[in-house]
Structure formats: structure tokens, C-alpha cells
Amino acid sequence: MGQSSLLVAFLAIGMPLANTLPGFAKEVRVYSGRHYNTDRQVFKTFSENTGIKVRLIEATGITLIERLKREGNNSNADIILLVDSARINNAAKEGLLAPIQSEQIKKNVPARYRDPNNRWFGLTRRVRAIIVNPKLIDPSSIKTYADLAKPDLKGKLCLRKRKNVYNQSLVADQIVLKGEANATNWVKGMVKNVNQPFFGGDTSLIRAVGQGKCAVGVVNHYYLARMQAGASGENDQKLTQPIKLIMPNPAHVNISAAGMAKSAKNKKEAIALITFLTSPKGSSSIAGPTYEYPLNGFGTSSQLKAFGRFKPDNVSISELGETQKRAIQIMANSGWR
């Protein structure tokens, strides 16, 4: 995206030129649980066009939440960026986020991807997708998450460890959609089908599917997109090319999100940055290089186009937070290690 286009976006969100030119000592401090160099470029361009310096601190989501709790009102954080509904909902429940009253931000973010109380707002979308090694199983035989619990997949399924927040949110999603009893039976069915020990990460799970150690797996879509695009090297690119990604119908969609810290000292600057990041141009700027989906639309990369479109299920991000704790209990009681 050219700087002139970004400047138009900043003007559209109401940043007065007199207050955005370099030389004005304005800044916004961001605590980010996202770890992408491409995010830094988006912040840099924002600073160049507004004169608002972005000071960035990166750590895991859990670490950042604990830091905010420890710092209290003395925190220097203005914005917190987190991945997954569980983390952003947790930050809100802990009273770490301040509501933002902005009609523009609400217009930017569909209701299902923002907090009903305006404490956080989605920036990008990620699908918890199913991947298949077509040499071991017919991809057309799997269309929904429910299919992962079918007995004919016994010894063929690979899953990430229970402590992973992405799978916790997937189970929470199914509790909302299908009810606790059905979700419990589904989890038990998947655990019975597991082949390998539970994996520590999506990347290693994808490699196992490519190597034929697993026939089926569950991963966030962008991990496979990056590997197929060559982002992790030629060997991974070659290994993963045959893997087929299935968008379950309907699909569990999660987000990365931003909220203004309750302790924010630079509120106007924080709102300006969040307004931009949630705008069509801002969301696309963050999502594009990481192969995530913007808030609206399905991206422009060849990898995402090859995955096809998806139909999100009817569960809102805030609903996931309400069932997360029960999801973890069900996973533990069902033998998901």
C-alpha cells in the first residue's frame, strides 16, 4: 500500500493534519502478542504519515496480560494486541481494557468480531482448518469438524496439545454450536482417533501430515499457506505442496484483536491507531503478509485463493470467552493431553 493511500485513510479517520506532521511529540505504546516483522512496517508507515511514534513491546499474550496486571495504573501501555479470542476476552474480564466509543471503529468491525462493550476490536481473521494427505485419505470424505470423530479415522488423526489456545477455542466454539453433551462426545471421538502423540505446534503437525505420519490434522490456515508459499524454506514448501486444506462448513473463525489499555496515557493516539488498523486498508496491511484474512473479504494471495472461500459459523468471539473454561475441562476429562 502506498503512503498516499494510507494518508487518505488517516484523514478519513479524523486525524487533523496540524497534529500529524513530524515534529509533534506524540506517541502510542503498543504491547503486542503478535510477532511479525510485517506488523512493524505497518506501524512505521503509520508513524511516517501521522507523526505519531509507535513504541512496540512484544511478548506472549499471557506474559503481556500478567505484565499489565502487575503494572496497574502505572503501566505505559496504550494498546494491547493479542491473538485468539481466549486471550483478548481474558484481558477484558481482568479489567485491563478501556471501552472506546467510536462509530468509525464500530463501522469498520463486524459486530461478531468486536466486544459488545467496545473494549476490544478484531483486526484479522484466522480459520481453524482441516488438512489432509490425499495419498492416505480422500479429501472429499471430510467436510465438517464432526467428521474428525468418525471411527474410520482411527489411527489417522493428529492434534495439537490440549494447552494450545487455538484448540481450546475450537472446542468452546463447538460447545456453543452443538451443546456440551455433543461437544464432549465429539472430543472423545477425536481423541480415540489420534495416531501420534499430541503435537507442540501447528508447523510440526503439518510436516507430519506431509510425511504421511498422519492422514488428517487440524491447524490454523495461515501456517499451511506460509509453508506452501516457501516462507519456511524450500524443503517445507516441497513437502507441503500435496497437502489439501479443507474449510469446514461452517468454519470456526478466530481473530487477532486490539484494545485500549485502561491505563492508557495517550488515548487519542491509541484510538487513531486502532481506527486505522481496523479500517479496510489497515486490516489488509496486517493480514496480507501473514496470510491471515482481513476482517472483510478473503485476501488476495494465490495461496488463500487456492484454499477457497469459507462460511463462518454463527458463534461470536465474545461467546467463545464464556465457554473457554468448560472447553478446557472437557478436553482434560476426555484424555486430550
Q: Where do the PLM segments sit?
A:
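Bacterial N-terminal signal peptides
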Residues: S4-N19
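Early extracytoplasmic/lumenal segment of secretory-pathway proteins
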Residues: A25-N90, R337
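An extracytoplasmic/periplasmic, membrane-proximal ligand-sensing/linker region
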Residues: A181-A183, E292-R337
